[in-house]
């Protein structure tokens, strides 16, 4: 009857909200009547030792939902955590390990031993069933290393490679504790778990992992580029797990839409990337607003000083788990690395042959340095392949459609900038191609980590200039893996016409190039007569060319012979030739328009620089 009344009176309410309200009232009526009746009976008989009801209780037990008649959406959850105890401690099973768990554990890349059966973990049957439906019945040993101390309620900091499956490892204990907590105390309105991620893509991936592993929990993904009003309404209905980027989290906190006072679990995923993308201050603001009594977990591929500072300030006697060990290898074991030399004018034309030979007919991601290169390369490849571009100038809605199409196999090649390198939720990527040298080793690792995930095989190919062999060796040393050098692919110069202007620079980071700014991470320059490069420069020119096309509508900056940047000219770009928009290169031309605009860290031997 209650269900019928609710359906008739709240027709505008969402199906999820209606179901939640019916469940809550039924739970209150049928599970709490007996204790309430016993209490009333004892009081009538004059008993004096009867335990008083909690302050937020009714004769039917603890309140589960509050119904408010006002213009905003109905609040179907009430705050009950403060009177219910602490889930992280209440449901922490005691794992017995020989010698106990110390302050530090190290797990190699393979972990050793067989996988841990999920059914043997003693977790909620709902989780076991959901994971089995996804084909997940065992955890890798590397995941077990995270899961067991997480189940104990320990704070931890984990050093993990990309693609190790750590999301599931820390997610299972959290959702299991929340499910058991809700079953005993009822569901509160405010989130019990907060996960911070540096990118939208990673946030969406983590939220999806939580949602699919525990369908009964309400999860939300909070990031910019989407209507904030819709997110505020969802938060008002009640949320168990909130996953998001720090910027949007703070925005919602300032608006009073997100209350973190009941958070019992906080996770910082890819914490080192938070620092790189400028979220360091936001992260600390959020951590300061959380309850002191909580379980905190932090995962990072590297341990810069900022991460160590966070650990001391916000984690309680954390267990350090090293999922990499003493090995210098930073990539998963299943990834095979290749390198191939190519001139700037022919670089785009060898993508097709590489995909045919190494792509195995599956998914391939090509990473470029700039949005302009991504667009132009995707346009050229689309003449022969099903291909799309993904970068920061594309709207969030279009990005999601593009990623969905790539996941579903509607097209096989995705050309992307580094906006997609972290947390890209695309399973079964067989091949990653680095269109040019990345800015640093970390970028290389996270690009390459899109393949070979969760124990699967994959390949990564690095395209480099003839004069960048030293840079390739430096990457090998930093990553701890060796490249297999592929034979050069002959390309007729006429066949490169459809890619004219794409990737004209041959520089990139790690130096290289006769005039380029030299050392590791310095965005070295191209050599000979080739020009400065498009949209962001990444190298200056040497020789007689004025640098070819600069950014924003330039011709791409290939050598004057192919792209129109005539000798002693400043090319076609709007910012000049020496590596525009932060070019970090050098320019030896006496007539060029000068060194990098926007403060490029290069040298300039010209006599007329500006």
From Swiss-Prot:
Domain Helicase C-terminal: 350-494
SUPFAM superfamilies named in the record: P-loop containing nucleoside triphosphate hydrolases
Record-listed E.C. numbers: 3.6.4.13
Disulfide bonds: none
Motif DEAD box location, chain numbering: 269-272
EC category: hydrolase
An individual GO BP term: response to cold
Transit peptide location on this chain: 1-66
Catalysis: reaction(s): ATP + H2O = ADP + phosphate + H(+)
Binding residues annotated for ATP, in chain numbering: 160-167
Biased composition (Gly residues): 542-557, 573-585
Helicase ATP-binding domain mapped to chain residues: 147-321
Domain of life of the source: Eukaryota
Ranges of Low complexity composition bias in the record: 558-572, 586-596
A Pfam family per the record: DEAD
GO cellular component: cytoplasm; cytosol; mitochondrion; protein-containing complex; viral replication complex
Family that this chain belongs to: Belongs to the DEAD box helicase family. DDX21/DDX50 subfamily.
This protein's domain notes: The Q motif is unique to and characteristic of the DEAD box family of RNA helicases and controls ATP binding and hydrolysis.
The name this protein goes by in its record: DEAD-box ATP-dependent RNA helicase 9, mitochondrial
């Amino acid at each position: 009857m209650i269900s019928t009344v609710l359906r008739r009176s709240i027709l505008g309410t969402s199906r999820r909200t209606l179901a939640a309200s019916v469940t809550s009232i039924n739970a209150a009526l049928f599970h709490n009547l007996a204790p309430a009746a016993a209490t009333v009976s004892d009081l009538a008989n004059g008993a004096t030792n009867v335990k008083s009801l909690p302050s937020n209780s009714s004769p039917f037990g603890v309140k589960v939902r509050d119904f408010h008649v006002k213009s905003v959406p109905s609040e179907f959850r009430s705050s009950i955590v403060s009177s219910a105890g602490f889930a992280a401690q209440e449901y922490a099973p005691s794992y017995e390990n020989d010698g106990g768990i110390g302050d530090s554990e190290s797990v190699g890349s393979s972990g050793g031993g067989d996988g841990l059966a999920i059914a043997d973990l003693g977790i909620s049957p709902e989780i076991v069933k959901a994971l089995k439906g996804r084909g997940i019945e065992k955890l890798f040993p590397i995941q077990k290393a995270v899961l067991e101390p997480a189940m104990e309620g320990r704070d931890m900091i984990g050093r993990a490679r990309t693609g190790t499956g750590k999301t599931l490892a820390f997610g299972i204990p959290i959702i299991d504790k929340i499910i058991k907590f809700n079953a005993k105390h009822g569901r509160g309105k405010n989130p019990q778990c907060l996960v911070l991620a540096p990118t939208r893509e990673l946030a969406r991936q983590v939220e999806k992992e939580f949602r699919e592993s525990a369908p009964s929990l309400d999860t939300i993904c909070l990031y910019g580029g989407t209507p904030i009003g819709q997110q505020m309404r969802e938060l008002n209905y009640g949320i168990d797990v909130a996953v998001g980027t720090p910027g949007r989290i703070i925005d919602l906190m300032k608006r009073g839409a997100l209350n973190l006072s009941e958070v019992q679990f906080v996770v910082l995923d890819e914490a080192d990337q938070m620092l790189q993308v400028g979220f360091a201050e936001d992260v600390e603001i959020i951590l300061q607003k959380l309850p002191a009594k909580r379980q905190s977990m932090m995962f990072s591929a590297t341990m810069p000083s900022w991460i160590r500072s966070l650990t001391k300030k916000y984690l309680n006697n954390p267990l350090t788990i090293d999922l990499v060990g003493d090995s210098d290898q930073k990539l998963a074991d299943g990834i095979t690395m290749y390198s191939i030399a190519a001139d700037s004018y022919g670089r785009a034309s060898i993508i097709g042959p590489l995909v045919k030979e190494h792509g195995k007919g599956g998914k391939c991601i090509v990473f470029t340095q700039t949005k302009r290169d991504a667009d132009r390369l995707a346009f050229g490849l689309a003449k022969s392949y099903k291909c799309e571009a993904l970068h920061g100038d594309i709207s969030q809605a279009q990005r999601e459609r593009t990623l969905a199409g790539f996941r579903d196999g509607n097209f096989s090649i995705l050309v992307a900038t580094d906006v997609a390198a972290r947390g890209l939720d695309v399973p079964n990527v067989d091949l990653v191609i680095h269109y040019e040298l990345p800015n640093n080793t970390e970028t290389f690792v996270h690009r390459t980590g899109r393949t070979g995930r969760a124990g699967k095989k994959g390949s990564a190919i690095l395209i480099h200039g003839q004069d960048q062999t030293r840079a390739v060796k430096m990457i090998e040393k930093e990553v701890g893996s060796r490249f297999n050098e592929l034979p050069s692919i002959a390309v007729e110069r006429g066949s490169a016409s459809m890619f004219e202007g794409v990737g004209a620079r041959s520089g990139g980071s790690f130096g290289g190039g006769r005039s380029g700014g030299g050392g590791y991470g310095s965005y070295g320059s191209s050599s000979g007569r080739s020009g400065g490069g498009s949209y962001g420069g990444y190298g200056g020119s040497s020789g007689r060319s004025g640098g070819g096309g600069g950014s924003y509508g330039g011709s791409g900056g290939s050598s004057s012979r192919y792209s129109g940047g005539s000798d002693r000219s400043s090319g076609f770009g709007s910012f000049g030739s020496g590596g525009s928009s932060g070019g970090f290169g050098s320019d030896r031309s006496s007539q060029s328009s000068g060194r990098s605009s926007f403060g490029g860290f290069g040298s300039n031997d010209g006599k007329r620089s500006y």
